[in-house]
């Protein structure tokens, strides 16, 4: 796998570091050749908890979705290892779903996971056995989307006590605001 973007925040990405990332992520090629883009960000942070000092974020674009992992560790190379392991589990799941849909005669490409985000606290161990993963939708909600600004959507989200809020922006596009782990907010919109 070729890494299209490798960047560092508060750290210089050395050639040995680049080679290590490429070596670890090249293992993922055995699961799919449909990775269209790969972005890796290595970050060193000044935090009290040394175990969270180094952060590795990896985002892989596959047909129909994004596969993402974020891992923390005191050692940058160990964080890279952990992120690679998480991505391997997620791609194994992706490949299993893809093959199952092909066998059932469904059209290609497989709609991949909307976003599979895993962090150091929940490193995806529940997904180790892909064949046992059967998601069950236990509740459905339908509601009218009212036009509002992203800031108003955040206010609504906080008022409801939710971690995300789906809304229609002032241009008529659907968007989602969400609470990030760092306490800030994110906005997801369609292109």
Swiss-Prot record:
Region described as Disordered: 100-123
UniProt xrefs under InterPro entries: HPF/YfiA_ribosome-assoc (IPR050574), HPF_long/plastid (IPR034694), RHF-like (IPR036567), RHF/RaiA (IPR003489), Ribosom_S30AE_C (IPR032528), Ribosom_S30AE_C_sf (IPR038416)
One GO cellular component term: cytosolic small ribosomal subunit
Location within or outside the cell: Cytoplasm
Keywords: Cytoplasm, Translation regulation
Pfam families: Ribosom_S30AE_C, Ribosomal_S30AE
A GO molecular-function descriptor: ribosomal small subunit binding
GO biological process: negative regulation of translational elongation
Subunit architecture: Interacts with 100S ribosomes.
Family label: Belongs to the HPF/YfiA ribosome-associated protein family. Long HPF subfamily.
Function: Required for dimerization of active 70S ribosomes into 100S ribosomes in stationary phase; 100S ribosomes are translationally inactive and sometimes present during exponential growth.
Name of this chain's protein: Ribosome hibernation promotion factor
Organism: Deinococcus radiodurans (strain ATCC 13939 / DSM 20539 / JCM 16871 / CCUG 27074 / LMG 4051 / NBRC 15346 / NCIMB 9279 / VKM B-1422 / R1)
Organism lineage string: Bacteria, Thermotogati, Deinococcota, Deinococci, Deinococcales
Gene behind the chain: hpf
């Amino acid at each position: 796998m070729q890494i299209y973007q490798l960047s560092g925040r508060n750290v210089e990405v050395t050639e040995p570091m680049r080679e290590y990332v490429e070596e670890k992520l090249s293992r993922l090629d055995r699961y799919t050749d449909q990775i269209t883009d790969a972005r890796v960000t290595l970050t060193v942070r000044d935090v009290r908890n040394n175990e969270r000092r180094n952060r590795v974020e990896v985002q892989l674009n596959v047909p129909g979705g994004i596969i993402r992992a974020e891992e923390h560790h005191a050692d940058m190379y160990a964080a890279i290892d952990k992120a690679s392991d998480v991505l391997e589990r997620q791609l194994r799941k992706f490949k299993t779903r893809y093959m199952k849909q092909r066998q059932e005669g469904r059209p290609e490409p497989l709609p991949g996971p909307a976003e599979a985000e895993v962090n150091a606290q929940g490193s995806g161990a529940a997904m180790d056995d892909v064949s046992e993963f059967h998601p069950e939708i236990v509740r459905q909600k339908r509601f009218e989307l009212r036009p509002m600004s992203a800031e108003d959507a955040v206010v609504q989200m906080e008022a409801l006590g939710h971690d995300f809020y789906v809304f229609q922006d002032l241009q008529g596009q659907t968007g989602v605001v969400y609470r990030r782990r760092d306490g800030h907010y994110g906005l997801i919109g369609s292109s």
